[in-house]
Structures are given as structure tokens and as C-alpha cells.
């Protein structure tokens, strides 16, 4: 069977193991071809090709449900569920998404992008099935990294107390998440995987059985049962954790042995309650470069298949905000042993891998456990340390209660660096960092700031570590502005003070964070039309620089706010409320992300769709200025890409 001819995953039923192995080869070839050209997640999908095919041999995908945790390992799933022909459009605007989306395919049973949700969702589906008297299988596929997340363990705890609810959890154990997983559970899985009896059974015994004179290639059912019995006798603690929690445990089994997985999944489906099949896979399987560097090839930009090296950028780029943050934090930690960097399984993405290498004693990786990371930092701050928590904006949403309850209310000196704040591009709506402005400004005692460039980031980091309360700094994905950087001696910023970047009498533009460069470009375009703008870099969301902004707004009378975040409750709302509370009522135009989900595309395409390029903003502002001349009545106007408040 050729993969391009596969119209439905059920067409895989009845194929021999040899035929399935040929399909697996085609999946890897297509996977590598597309990701090498367009970029995307590489290692996770390559590692689960056989697992996917074996599992789907035992399911009826017209009715059975499969929930893939996170979804970045589901490229093989997409290739056998009707998206082969469109796969070249992976992660491109209007094309195949990099994660699972219910609106994209009937076979994407649950959307995802964040880790540790699959078991809860699959259990919910199983309970809905049983309550309605229906008959279908529910399966969650979760990695060993995601299993460290508290939500996954909560779901296992719940499911284990429902002995009559059939649910299959497939543990994809590749000893990795994005980076190597951490914690006691991960160590336990590693001991199971590498124990001498397990290695002996997985290798020597099976190989000896295969070479018995009356044996062919695959072991018959009788010897498979003998092998499983020997496995349990030799390693009595295998799976004890899961069995104590109410699951029937099966494994560990070879995640690249199609026949063994099919037999095991078939047996697991016959269990009348929760079952867990522990599958050992190799991340990056089938591509030597990805197997050798499982962190580096977790996700890749476009690269050369022959060499495995990234294709060189057409133009050199400044260092990323993440890298500047990591380098600066290392310098600070070298001077202050009380500063500690904390990440939730995202060391490389946040720049904390630099601290991990330079000063491992001042670095903590808690695994996929954002809630724990925040309260751990709070505890450290209570007893004299200065923790710096670096987490993606979208993932910090998971710890909102801890930020309020454990940090904000107690006014503890914890610094949060929110990476990937704003538009992130090809990862789509689950990863856009568009909500942090709105949720951070509501938390008591927090100081919230965003730098206009990477040099200002350095100063904000120093300022936060000298401040007596909690601070949050949002930084965007990608390269900085290319401004000169200092190696040390950074001057702290006065808390709550913005700066004027440009003077003009016709319009006040107040920009927050990385949108300052676009604000200045917009002001240049307006100046060519005769509109002179004062441009202010707000720097701080909380507290706002009322001392600077109120007189300017009162004098100029026309205000535009620009932010890379959701307008509802955002920076523009904060400034509008501050002005109205002071009985200052200028005409106000808020530019930012309206009440929409921002789909996968390049950042530039997303900005264009949202009307947030300098040319588009200049056009919106010209319309706003024209309307301001025609009315003095208070009104609210909504546009596709802007929200307008006029008075």
C-alpha cells in the first residue's frame, strides 16, 4: 500500500507486519521531507510511527477515540487520516496545523498544544460513553515528560478508582520531553527501562527464543505469554506504581516492534477497566541526527536532510530576547548566589540552558509543572532567595491561582520572565502569548513591565531583582532589535516610569513592549502625511506612569495605544481606565488583538491579518483622527482589527 492512497485509517486493518513496516518507512520519509522544508516538530513524531500504526490496527477509527497529549507527536496520525496530500502546507497559513484541532479532522478527537491533558479528556469521553450506554474505545497517548504534569497524575488517580470504566493509557516512554524529564517518577520509569532483568528479557531471552530450531521469526502466543510471565517474575516492581493506583499495567514493551505492540494493545482492550501499556520508544527514530541529538531535533527550522544542519538565514539576525535574558541572568547569578533560575521543562526555549551549563547549582527544572514552579519560587522567596521563573506566556496561564494566592497576596519577591509573549507564529492559538497583559494587571502587588528592546530587558531584569515585591517581564519570541548590549553594570529603571521617544503636538501614541519599534515606524508614516506624534514607551503596565501620561493626554486630546496582546483588559484598557478615573476624556484608539483566536501563520502574516503593521496602523489612525473631528459624543466602535473608544 502506498501512503498517498490511504483514504481512511481503517484501511490499515488486515495488513501484515511487513506491510505495516513499509507504511512506517513511507511515513518517516514524508515526515522528514516536509519538516526539512517547512520546519516543525521532528523527533516526537519519528519516535511514534510504529506505535501509531500498531494502535490503529486495534481500533475502529469510525467510532473509537484517541487523544494525543500535546499533539506535536501526531504527524504520523495526520498522515494516515487524510492529510497526506496537504502535508506540504504544515504550519503555514491556511494549511495543516502543527497540533491537533477538532475543526481540522474528524479523527482529531481532542485539540491540544499544552501537556498533560490527554488522560483527563479520554476519561471524560469514557464516562460520557458509559453514561449514554454507547460502545467505543477511549485511548490516551501520553509521553513520560507530560506524565510529570500534575493534571495527568490527577487523572490517573481518578481513573484508577473507576474499575468498571474501560480506558487505555499508552505511555510513550522515550526518556525525553523537550529536554530530558526530571523528577522521581521519571527516575522510576528509567530504572524500569534499564534494569538488568528487563534488559535481559528484552534482549537475550527473546533472541534465544527466536533461534529455537522450531521457531520462525515472530514468537507464537504461547511463548509471548511465557515471556510476559518471566518479565513479571524477574522484575516484580515493574508497573507497581500504576497498579497501586488501580490500573492494569502491561509492559514495558518495545515501541518499534509492531507485532508485540499489536498483541499487547489487543490484550489491553479486553480489560474491563483502566489499563496502562508502557511502550519504550526512541525519539527521532530513523533519522540518525535526530537520534543522536534528541533535544536539538525536538523541533527544527528548515534544514538540510543530508547534513542535518539548519539552512542559513538569508540575513544575519540579532540574538533572541531569550538568549539575552539567559546570558544576563548567568552574569547576575555569578555575582549573587541567592539568585536562582527556575524553568518548567523549557530550559532551551527560555534561555535557561545557559544557566544550567554555567551554574547548575543555581538552576532548577521542575518538569512540566508550572503550578509547582510558581509556589516553589514563593517558598524560596520566603527564606531569602531571589527566584527568577522563566516560563512561556501561554504556559504560565496554568499557574494563575498560584501567582495570586502564593505570590501576589503575600507580596513575595519573585521575578517572572514570560517568554513568547505576543504573537508566536506557526504554533497557532494554543501557543500565542496574547493573554498575559490582561491577567497580570489584575494581580495584587505585582509590578508588570515589557522592554522595548533587549538592552531594556537587561535593565528590567536588574530592576526586578532589586524590587521588594513580585515582578513580571514579558518578552517576545525571536530576535531583538539589534541594539548595543552591556556585559555588566546595568542601571536599574525607576519603577513605574516611561519615556518619551518622540515629540509631536497632534497625537499621543503610547506603545507597550516590543510594539515600540512599530509605533515609531507608524509615527514616521503619519509625519509624512502632516501628523506629528508624541510616542511614549510605557515600559510599565503596573504601575502606569500617570505622572507622564496624564498631562500629555490632557494637552494633546487624541490618544492611541499599541500592544501585542488581547484588547480585552489589556494595556489600552488600563490606560483608558486611568485617564477616566482622573476625569481626563480624550479620544482614544486601542490597537491590539481583538476578540479572536490567532491561527498558525508567520508572525508577519498574523500582524497583517490583525491590522498591526505600521502601514495598517497609520491608516487606522488616520480614520480615527477624521472621526474625532466629526464627533464630540462618547461612543465605542469595534473594527475587525481595532477597538475604538472616542469621547
From Swiss-Prot:
Binds 1 Mg(2+) ion per subunit. Binds 1 thiamine pyrophosphate per subunit. Thiamine diphosphate binds at residues 72, 113-115, 145-146, 174, 287, 370. Belongs to the transketolase family. DXPS subfamily. Its EC number is 2.2.1.7. It catalyses: D-glyceraldehyde 3-phosphate + pyruvate + H(+) = 1-deoxy-D-xylulose 5-phosphate + CO2. Pathway: Metabolic intermediate biosynthesis; 1-deoxy-D-xylulose 5-phosphate biosynthesis; 1-deoxy-D-xylulose 5-phosphate from D-glyceraldehyde 3-phosphate and pyruvate: step 1/1. One of its GO terms (molecular function) is magnesium ion binding. GO terms for biological process: 1-deoxy-D-xylulose 5-phosphate biosynthetic process; isopentenyl diphosphate biosynthetic process, methylerythritol 4-phosphate pathway; terpenoid biosynthetic process; thiamine biosynthetic process. Mg(2+) binds at residues 144, 174. SMART domains: Transket_pyr. Keywords: Isoprene biosynthesis, Magnesium, Metal-binding, Thiamine biosynthesis, Thiamine pyrophosphate, Transferase. Homodimer. PROSITE patterns: TRANSKETOLASE_1 (PS00801), TRANSKETOLASE_2 (PS00802). Catalyzes the acyloin condensation reaction between C atoms 2 and 3 of pyruvate and glyceraldehyde 3-phosphate to yield 1-deoxy-D-xylulose-5-phosphate (DXP). The gene is dxs. InterPro entries: Dxylulose-5-P_synthase, THDP-binding, Transketo_C/PFOR_II, Transketolase-like_Pyr-bd, Transketolase_BS, Transketolase_C, Transketolase_CS. This is 1-deoxy-D-xylulose-5-phosphate synthase. HAMAP family: DXP_synth. GO terms for cellular component: cytosol. Its cofactor is Mg(2+); thiamine diphosphate. The lineage of its organism: Bacteria, Bacillati, Cyanobacteriota, Cyanophyceae, Synechococcales.
